[in-house]
């Protein structure tokens, strides 16, 4: 029976990895163009940017289609960006530690859903400096399910953890803005901190902020070295990396 779950998990991982390409490409553009909360990010089928032909379902099979088509459009031989293949492959590979660290099939799919959200938030924020509400808000729902599945994290600790993360991030930004007249984090960062706080509990929120601050500083330092005019960096990736370290440290304890 375990092999059935593993096969199902692999198939879902491949599908989510492929769908991540849609989310990463379309969602930031929809936000910038429409500035609206709810929208259908997959309202139109994918098409070749050169010849305009719709991409058929059999040319959208994760990983396999790219290899069989040699990274080209079936109709006009236009090169397909390697980034699509890399996103699918990296998502698929990184998904497997989640399966092996999960306690049962419900836990594995909850963690896979969380991974899908954080993976997309990481890439979108890194590329576009955006943390869409459409991806951040579902983390709260997953946190609720996760609490029911994991007795080590109580409902009280989850709620207080989210509240504490919100207060710390909001007050920190308010103080810096008061004296420096700049925002060190955006509203999306505060929401992400809050959502993640509900997943780790109040006891581990300080570690989240400590780690994310260190990682963000390292990121900022190298960004400044490579580009002296780069004043801002996306904070989301630092928050997500810190969460992964804290979260799986808790699970391995």
From Swiss-Prot:
One of its GO terms (cellular component) is plasma membrane. It catalyses: Typically cleaves a -Gly-|-Phe- bond to release an N-terminal, basic peptide of 5-8 residues from type IV prepilin, and then N-methylates the new N-terminal amino group, the methyl donor being S-adenosyl-L-methionine. Zinc is required for the N-terminal methylation of the mature pilin, but not for signal peptide cleavage. Zn(2+) binds at residues 48, 51, 73, 76. Keywords: Cell inner membrane, Cell membrane, Hydrolase, Membrane, Metal-binding, Methyltransferase, Multifunctional enzyme, Protease, S-adenosyl-L-methionine, Transferase, Transmembrane, Transmembrane helix, Zinc. InterPro entries: Peptidase_A24A_bac, Prepilin_IV_endopep_pep, Prepilin_pept_A24_N, Prepilin_peptidase/N-MTase. GO terms for biological process: methylation; signal peptide processing. The keyword S-adenosyl-L-methionine applies. GO terms for molecular function: aspartic-type endopeptidase activity; metal ion binding; methyltransferase activity. Its main location: membrane. Gene3D superfamilies: 1.20.120.1220. Its EC number is 3.4.23.43, 2.1.1.-. It is found in: Cell inner membrane. Belongs to the peptidase A24 family. Plays an essential role in type IV pili and type II pseudopili formation by proteolytically removing the leader sequence from substrate proteins and subsequently monomethylating the alpha-amino group of the newly exposed N-terminal phenylalanine. This is Prepilin leader peptidase/N-methyltransferase. It comes from Vibrio cholerae serotype O1 (strain ATCC 39541 / Classical Ogawa 395 / O395). The lineage of its organism: Bacteria, Pseudomonadati, Pseudomonadota, Gammaproteobacteria, Vibrionales. The gene is tcpJ.
């Amino acid at each position: 029976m375990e092999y059935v779950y593993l096969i199902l998990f692999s198939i879902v991982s491949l599908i989510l990895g492929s769908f991540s390409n849609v989310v990463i490409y379309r969602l930031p553009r929809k936000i910038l163009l429409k500035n609206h909360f709810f929208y259908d990010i997959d309202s139109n089928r994918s098409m070749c940017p050169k010849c305009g032909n719709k991409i058929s379902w059999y040319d959208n099979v994760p990983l396999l289609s790219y290899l069989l088509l040699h990274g080209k459009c079936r109709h006009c031989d236009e090169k397909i960006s390697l980034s699509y293949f890399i996103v699918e492959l990296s998502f698929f590979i990184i998904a497997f530690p989640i399966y092996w660290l999960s306690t049962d099939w419900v836990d594995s799919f909850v963690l896979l859903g969380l991974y899908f959200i954080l993976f997309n938030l990481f890439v979108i924020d890194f590329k576009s400096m955006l943390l869409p509400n459409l991806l951040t808000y579902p983390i709260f729902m997953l946190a609720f399910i996760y609490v029911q599945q994991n007795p080590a994290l109580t409902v009280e600790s989850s709620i207080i953890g989210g509240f504490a993360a919100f207060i710390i991030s909001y007050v920190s930004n308010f103080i810096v803005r008061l004296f420096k007249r700049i925002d060190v984090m955006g509203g999306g960062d505060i929401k992400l901190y809050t959502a993640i706080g509900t997943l780790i509990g109040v006891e581990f929120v300080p570690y989240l902020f400590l780690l994310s601050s260190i990682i963000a500083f390292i990121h900022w330092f190298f960004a400044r070295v490579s580009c002296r005019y780069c004043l801002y960096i996306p904070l989301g990736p630092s928050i997500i990396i810190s969460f992964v370290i804290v979260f799986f440290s808790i699970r391995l304890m």
